[in-house]
Amino acid sequence: EFQDFREYDYELIMALTKRLNNVVLVGDYHQHSVSATNNSGKPFKNKSKDVSYDDFVAELRNSGFEVDLTTLNKSRRCSAEICNYISEKLHISITSNGDHSGSVVWIDDDPTVVLNQNQITKLVFNEAASYTFHAMNWSYSKGDTVNSACVILTDGLDNLDSESFDPEKVKLTTLNKLYVAMTRSRGDLYLIKASTFKKLKDAYIAH
C-alpha cells in the first residue's frame, strides 16, 4: 500500500530505497487520500495543488525507479463489465482477469428492492452507522470484498450516468473514494443517485 505513505513516512521510504537493493513498492495511485487520516501532503500534494497520476509516475522515475504500470492492472475482484464502466466514466485504467461476472445496474426506477436486501452491501459517502441497512463509508470499504454492492452517490455525482459527465470536474479525493467504492463487488454493482435516495432516506434512518 505504497500510496498510503505520506510526508515524513514517504520520505523515510524513499531514503530507505536508496540504501537497499531490489526494493519493490506496490500501490494504487487512485486509492490515495481515501483514508480518514494521513491523507494530505507529499507526494500527492504540491503545496495546495494535487499531483496528477502522470506527474507522480514521472517523479518516481526521476527518483530512479522502474515503474511497472501493467503487471497488477487486472482486478481479481471486479467483472469485465464493471472495470470497463469505471475506465469509461472515471478515466481510470482498470481491467478484469475474468474470475467473476457482474453487471452495472442503475436502480433509480425501483430502488427499494436493492435497498431492502441485506445481502447487498450499501456504500455511502459518510455516516454509514446512521442507517438501518448494512452500510459502509466509501473510504472505510477500502480493501474489502463483498458479493454485491450498492453505491449511493453524492449530489455532485448525480450525472454519472450522463454522457456529459466529466471526472476532471470532480474533486480528486472524492473521485478516488468513488473508485474504491465501485471496485468492492465481486458480483453486481448497483448505483443509485443522491436525488433518488433523498426521497427514501428517512425510511432507512436508524432512530
Where are these regions (language model features)?
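Conserved helicase motor core of SF1/SF2 NTP-dependent helicases
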Residues: E1-N116, T121, F125-V180, R184-H207
